[in-house]
Amino acid sequence: GLDCPTGRALAAGPLKLTTDAEARTPSGTLSLTDINERTLKSLDVKFGLGTFTAITGVSGSGKSTLLYTLANSLRERVKTSVDDGDVASKSKGPAEKTGSARATTVELSADLNSDIAINRLVQISQKPIGRTPRSCLATYTGLFDRVRKLFAQTDEAKRRGWTVSRFSYNVTQGRCPTCSGEGQIEVELVFLPGSYTPCPDCHGARYNSETLEVTWNGRTIADVLELTVAEAREVFADEEAIARALRALSAVGLDYLRLGQPATELSGGEAQRIKLATELQRAQRGHTVYLMDEPTTGLHPADVDLLMTELQRLVNNGNTVVVVEHDMRVAAQADRVLEMGPGAGARGGQVVADGSPATVAQTDTATGRVLAERSSS
């Protein structure tokens, strides 16, 4: 076979399934009792803290509803809830619309040690990181604040009396007046959604010409926004805070994105991985529950492996990860597979298989059959 990512993926051997013996032992239990949401009827489900759970099942079987219900129930009980909806639309998930979510009770089991109380809930969805070009990779991850500091510390910036705000494309002094720092101009089209075209004055640089007279190591701040993550890792190798953020982006397979890539040009999967990387660079030990809906959508198998490495690292640090997933490469590596079904809609909403991937592979269910088939060569 060809030695390239796709060639290696096609030639990859059978999936290795986590066995009962290999699965992590939960450090505590999270119980959801009597869930009545959409297709879920009087359902009781337990999740193991400090483990990796993959919720699988056919489309419409209730996977996402279960995840939303877990999120809503936890949200009322944790100190910090990071729901990425704050930057995107305020539209509510299915479980939040129905109103009966309040009936769902979450009990932290008695064997939950006080030192692993959950104090953070992080929901990572595929909502955009912003709706206009004003939000970009560098601003969302926070690394741009540190880059601006470097520019403000240059002799030339000090000589001119400029502070970090001069190097923000959201501030009048530094930004291009024509596009107001967006680097693009929205074109209104009759009967069609508007689209963006590069600014005729700054040509996408976002800044006015005076701001671009200041350089750091021979680069303007607009040059920095043009760097890809991979290029920026070399440029900022000695700046630990920036390098750490870049390493996290690289770890989820985003080496190819430009630092200034506008939110409007990012796919849902890319947005989700940017959020994950932003979390990874500040991941504390334990105490956090991460919920993700289809994190591998649109990913190449090589990127799925990168993502799995990072998710496993979160769990190794004592955190809890629950994902809804169609990708069997993810399910195979989970500690536990929770399969919803047996069908969709009214014919779904039940747990039809539950156990380590190796155990589920022995059941005659949709996920079980695929795991069995993919794990035997």
Region roles according to the model:
Residues G1-S377:
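Conserved phosphate-binding elements of NTP-dependent enzyme cores
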